[in-house]
């Protein structure tokens, strides 16, 4: 069982618009950075997708994962239990249910703790995630966010 620290950020230009996410994973001496961009999406989808991709990148189950995010949407949905209420109601009338279902599948394989951090507050890893997310949103060859629904 590893101790993992994860920083995430997501952005969308126009909301909806082109978007991207950035993830920094750290465990002991190991560090991994992940990012990608999408043609049409929202900032909330990119914030949530960053967390999902980070968790999916872990090679084994049962890790202790601390996730630092500046997204109240993601942090509060989990920490305040809203997500589990939505799940009990089969995500009726909930946006991003495709991503929340994907999140739950990987979330339950680890011990995850969320910590909200203020964005643009000079945290080096959060700032790096922000630069990666924005860089990807401005990039060429953006992917399609097939789950996005206006």
Located regions from the model:
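RNase H-like nuclease fold core
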Residues: 1-45, 49, 53-63, 131, ...
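RNase H catalytic domain
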Residues: 8-18, 52-128, 132, 137
């Amino acid at each position: 069982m590893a101790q993992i620290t994860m920083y995430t950020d997501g952005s969308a230009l126009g909301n909806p618009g082109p978007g991207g996410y950035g993830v920094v994973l750290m465990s002991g001496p190991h560090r991994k950075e992940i990012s990608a961009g999408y043609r049409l999406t929202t900032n909330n989808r990119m914030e949530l997708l960053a967390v999902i991709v980070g968790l999916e990148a872990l090679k084994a189950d049962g890790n202790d994962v601390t996730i630092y995010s500046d997204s109240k949407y993601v942090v509060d949905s989990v920490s305040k239990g809203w997500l589990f209420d939505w799940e009990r109601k089969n995500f009726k009338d909930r946006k991003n249910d495709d991503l929340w279902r994907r999140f739950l599948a990987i979330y339950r394989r680890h011990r995850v703790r969320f910590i909200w951090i203020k964005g643009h507050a000079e945290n080096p890893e959060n700032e790096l995630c922000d630069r990666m997310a924005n860089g990807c949103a401005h990039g060429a060859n953006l992917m399609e966010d097939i789950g996005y629904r206006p």
